[in-house]
């Protein structure tokens, strides 16, 4: 059983692993800890800090204390620095004659070391132990989830409907081997983070006691490095191996980092063996991640892998209307349709375009109209018109499939030529404003019905053929960026 005086350094290590550096340094690190025989006092610098710690972190501190010490312990929050911490308990519980009162030492703000914070063994009054009271929002704070990312606020369309359906199943039944791990991939700004955090928020809502952690892959790497530097790696492993739900964003950042991949391999195995849920996002299909450990790539495919594709026109309009509604904006259908037609790449850029329009409207003191939108987004519209042309599409597709550019205009009908040509026609219909006859002319003088047939064929194949679906999405991303 751990002595009370050893509690605070271990508690600090756990908080540093859980919280952002700003949260840790602002609220937890400045606390002064005084350990007694049956209780622990934590001193905050002022009433505001005390109130915030009590509301957000007290229940977590109590949980850590019981976990570290092996028994429930009363945690008292008080106002005052080291001097108050040394004197207050003494007044309530006299010491033996001649025994000096050791002064508590606060965490040294200059070094940042986990071992910098120590506690004193000043006796505290024997206080009747009471069950810890849950702090409002304290548990959710430690998850690092954005409470705004919910299933209700997620717009659904063809591009993400499969991923959303799977996410709902996982949110209701985390740990189900059918969906474990859950691997979501797709281009930037398509809502992968929103989707997986919606799972986390749903699970937390159903079970606030669940140990949930959302973390970006780069932060996970930094946490590993810090754990090594502070010789707190056992604590790091114990924390991550004990989670009920782990959500890691942009896991492609692990590639080439051998130590990180090794440690994640063990954490991954520990969680799945314990029936816990692992959820990851990535910018590419697992087998296409260069520099990733083959053992991890194999394990990524154990559960369910789904792709999120760029939103189609109807979904883009719905996203804009929902965003406008959330911000109490009046947005006409014609305006939403125009923005959605011209900003096709991803959700992030779509919302960014709307913010620009709103800002332009406010600065110019004009209502949002089609003319105002065209003026506000003129550089985006010009860039889009410059970048996406049939010539550009043909060259990009030819390079991607490693065929000659001339094959786009030829009469060759072999599958390895015809299929890329059909893909290029479908992309031309989606990404340009050209008519079907004009697209046909650009592909060697073909009839508009040939273009229509190509578009229909590719649309059907994207539903049934994962390879075509991946190729098409990759080409969309290349052309839009």
Curated annotation (Swiss-Prot):
One of its GO terms (molecular function) is ATP hydrolysis activity. ATP binds at residues 189, 191-193. Keywords: ATP-binding, Cytoplasm, DNA replication, DNA-binding, Lipid-binding, Nucleotide-binding. Residues 362-481 are annotated as: Domain IV, binds dsDNA. Residues 144-361 are annotated as: Domain III, AAA+ region. Its main location: cytoplasm. It comes from the Bacteria. Residues 1-71 are annotated as: Domain I, interacts with DnaA modulators. GO terms for biological process: DNA replication initiation; regulation of DNA replication. Residues 86-96 have a biased composition (Low complexity). Domain I is involved in oligomerization and binding regulators, domain II is flexibile and of varying length in different bacteria, domain III forms the AAA+ region, while domain IV binds dsDNA. Plays an essential role in the initiation and regulation of chromosomal replication. ATP-DnaA binds to the origin of replication (oriC) to initiate formation of the DNA replication initiation complex once per cell cycle. Binds the DnaA box (a 9 base pair repeat at the origin) and separates the double-stranded (ds)DNA. Forms a right-handed helical filament on oriC DNA; dsDNA binds to the exterior of the filament while single-stranded (ss)DNA is stabiized in the filament's interior. Belongs to the DnaA family. This is Chromosomal replication initiator protein DnaA. It comes from Laribacter hongkongensis (strain HLHK9).
């Amino acid at each position: 059983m751990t002595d009370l005086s050893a509690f605070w350094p271990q508690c600090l290590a756990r908080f540093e692993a859980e919280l952002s550096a700003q949260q840790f340094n602002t609220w937890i690190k400045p606390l002064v800890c005084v350990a007694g025989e049956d209780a622990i006092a934590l001193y905050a610098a002022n009433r505001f800090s005390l109130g915030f710690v009590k509301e957000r972190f007290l229940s977590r501190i109590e949980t850590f204390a019981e976990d570290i010490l092996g028994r429930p312990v009363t945690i008292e929050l008080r106002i005052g620095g080291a001097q108050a911490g040394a004197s207050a308990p003494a007044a309530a519980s006299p010491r033996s004659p001649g025994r000096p009162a050791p002064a508590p030492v606060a965490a040294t703000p200059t070094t940042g070391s986990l071992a910098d914070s120590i506690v004193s063994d000043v006796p505290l009054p024997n206080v009747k132990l009471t069950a810890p009271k849950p702090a409002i929002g304290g548990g959710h704070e430690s998850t690092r989830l954005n409470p705004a990312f919910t299933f209700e606020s997620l717009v659904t369309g063809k591009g993400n409907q499969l991923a959303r359906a799977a996410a709902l199943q996982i949110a209701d039944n985390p740990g189900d081997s059918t969906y474990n791990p859950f691997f979501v991939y797709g281009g930037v700004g398509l809502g992968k983070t929103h989707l997986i955090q919606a799972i986390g928020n749903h699970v937390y809502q159903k079970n606030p006691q669940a140990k949930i952690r959302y973390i970006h892959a780069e932060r996970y790497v930094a946490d590993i490095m810090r754990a090594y530097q502070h010789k707190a790696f056992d604590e790091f492993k114990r924390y991550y191996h004990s989670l009920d739900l782990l959500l890691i964003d942009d896991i492609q950042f692990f590639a080439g980092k051998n130590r990180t991949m090794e440690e994640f391999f063990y954490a991954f195995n520990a969680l799945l063996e314990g029936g816990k849920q692992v959820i990851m996002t990535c910018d590419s299909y697992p087998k296409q991640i260069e520099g990733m450990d083959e053992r991890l790539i194999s394990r990524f495919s154990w559960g369910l892998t789904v792709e999120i594709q760029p939103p189609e026109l109807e979904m883009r309009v719905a996203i804009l209307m929902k965003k406008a509604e959330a911000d109490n904006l009046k947005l006409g259908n014609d305006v939403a349709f125009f923005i959605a037609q011209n900003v096709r790449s991803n959700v992030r850029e779509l919302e960014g375009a709307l913010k620009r329009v709103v800002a332009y409207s406010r600065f110019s003191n004009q209502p949002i109209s089609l003319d105002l939108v065209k003026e506000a987004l003129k550089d985006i519209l010009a860039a889009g018109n410059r970048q996406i042309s049939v010539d550009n599409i043909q060259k990009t597709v030819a390079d991607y499939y490693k065929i000659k550019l001339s094959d786009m205009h030829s009469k060759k009908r072999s599958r390895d030529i015809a299929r890329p040509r059909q893909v290029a026609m479908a992309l031309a219909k989606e990404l340009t404003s050209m008519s079907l006859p004009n697209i046909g002319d650009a592909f060697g003088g073909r009839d508009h019905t040939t273009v229509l047939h190509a578009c229909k064929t590719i649309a059907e194949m994207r539903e049934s053929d994962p390879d075509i679906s991946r190729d098409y999405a990759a080409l969309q991303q290349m052309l839009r960026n």
